[in-house]
């Protein structure tokens, strides 16, 4: 399998990208090098290799949820630069 200049132009058109002729030639060359390298994997003998879905056998380490005392509302409001009744006033970030 190889990549042609026509393939590069087609993908560029789909992505709405424009390239110079030299860049297209470079893409063709680079992509063909990558594909040739990947074809070397076909030469590997994998008969004795077990199928592995995930090479990392990591288990989640869960911890117990510990309820801790949080700040009282009055303390939060007292520490806020601006507040209105029970609400902290913050600068507008979305129009």
From Swiss-Prot:
Gene3D superfamilies: Glu-tRNAGln amidotransferase C subunit, N-terminal domain. Keywords: ATP-binding, Ligase, Nucleotide-binding, Protein biosynthesis. One of its GO terms (biological process) is regulation of translational fidelity. It holds the Pfam family GatC. This is Aspartyl/glutamyl-tRNA(Asn/Gln) amidotransferase subunit C. The gene is gatC. Allows the formation of correctly charged Asn-tRNA(Asn) or Gln-tRNA(Gln) through the transamidation of misacylated Asp-tRNA(Asn) or Glu-tRNA(Gln) in organisms which lack either or both of asparaginyl-tRNA or glutaminyl-tRNA synthetases. The reaction takes place in the presence of glutamine and ATP through an activated phospho-Asp-tRNA(Asn) or phospho-Glu-tRNA(Gln). One of its GO terms (molecular function) is glutaminyl-tRNA synthase (glutamine-hydrolyzing) activity. It catalyses: L-glutamyl-tRNA(Gln) + L-glutamine + ATP + H2O = L-glutaminyl-tRNA(Gln) + L-glutamate + ADP + phosphate + H(+); L-aspartyl-tRNA(Asn) + L-glutamine + ATP + H2O = L-asparaginyl-tRNA(Asn) + L-glutamate + ADP + phosphate + 2 H(+). PANTHER family: GLUTAMYL-TRNA(GLN) AMIDOTRANSFERASE SUBUNIT C, MITOCHONDRIAL. It comes from Clostridium botulinum (strain Langeland / NCTC 10281 / Type F). InterPro entries: Asp/Glu-ADT_sf_sub_c, GatC. Heterotrimer of A, B and C subunits. Its EC number is 6.3.5.-. Belongs to the GatC family.
